[in-house]
């Protein structure tokens, strides 16, 4: 709840700054931040689409694009916060799709636990797509986005934020578009060096920890 309120404020400020319905691309592995945006939309904030942006551990992308929420083997990537196959916050969306039927949701989650799979029916999938789009990026695509943004804007993105940016590029929605940034690039020196051959310096306020 606290996370939803805090992130709801973030969404609210951004929409107020534009004055028009806005699309958000949200880097996510566990479906928490993007679900907060969904709650903000349900409460009346004029959000158009929420893009679920993830890496090659793409269970959320497969759920939204194909209607199959099915766990696969986790791959280690340069965006480790997304190295997840079962997104715990997705249960909240299932609960909402079940019209807040806790018993049905409990059965669905039990089925996921036992079989590693949840098939989303057409009606529920259409409801999801009214609010969400999705995209996944490979390792090479993520590195290319970091390079592209640096060359175009002289801004260094961390791998997670790069996935959010790349997911937006894949959909290229009209209107106001905002990519949520996540971590400081200095946390991912190997990825940054590989993408643009640059060392991302530690912020001065954090230098004391080393």
Where are these regions (language model features)?
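Single conserved hydrophobic/aromatic residue that forms the stacking wall/gate
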Residues: 1-11
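Alpha-helix C-terminal capping segments
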Residues: 13-16, 35-46, 166-172
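Catalytic phosphate/nucleotide-handling subdomain of diverse soluble enzymes
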Residues: 45-62, 165-210
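Conserved active-site and cofactor/substrate-binding residues in soluble primary-metabolism enzymes
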Residues: 5, 32-35, 84-92, 137-144, ...
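A conserved active-site cap/scaffold subdomain adjacent to cofactor or substrate pockets
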Residues: 22, 26-103
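C-terminal structural cap/anchor segments
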Residues: 117-172
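Long, amphipathic alpha-helical stalk/connector segments used for oligomerization, subunit docking
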Residues: 103-120, 128
């Amino acid at each position: 709840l606290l996370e939803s309120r805090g992130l709801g404020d973030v969404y609210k400020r951004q929409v107020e700054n534009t004055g028009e319905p806005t699309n958000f691309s949200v880097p996510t592995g566990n479906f928490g931040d993007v679900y907060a945006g969904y709650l903000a939309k349900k409460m009346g904030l004029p959000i158009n689409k929420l893009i679920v942006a993830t890496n090659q551990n793409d269970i959320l992308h497969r759920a939204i694009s194909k209607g199959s929420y099915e766990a696969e083997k986790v791959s280690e990537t340069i965006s480790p916060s997304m190295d997840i196959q079962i997104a715990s916050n997705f249960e909240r969306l299932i609960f909402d799709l079940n019209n807040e039927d806790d018993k049905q949701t409990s059965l669905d989650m039990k089925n996921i636990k036992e079989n590693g799979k949840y098939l989303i029916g057409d009606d529920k999938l259409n409801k999801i797509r009214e609010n969400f789009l999705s995209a996944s990026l490979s390792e090479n695509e993520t590195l290319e986005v970091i390079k592209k943004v640096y060359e175009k804007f002289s801004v260094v993105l961390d791998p997670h934020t790069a996935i959010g940016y790349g997911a937006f590029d894949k959909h290229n929605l009209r209107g106001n578009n905002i990519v949520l940034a996540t971590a400081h690039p200095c946390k991912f020196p190997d990825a940054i060096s590989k993408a643009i051959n640059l060392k991302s310096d530690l912020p001065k306020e954090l230098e004391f920890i080393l």
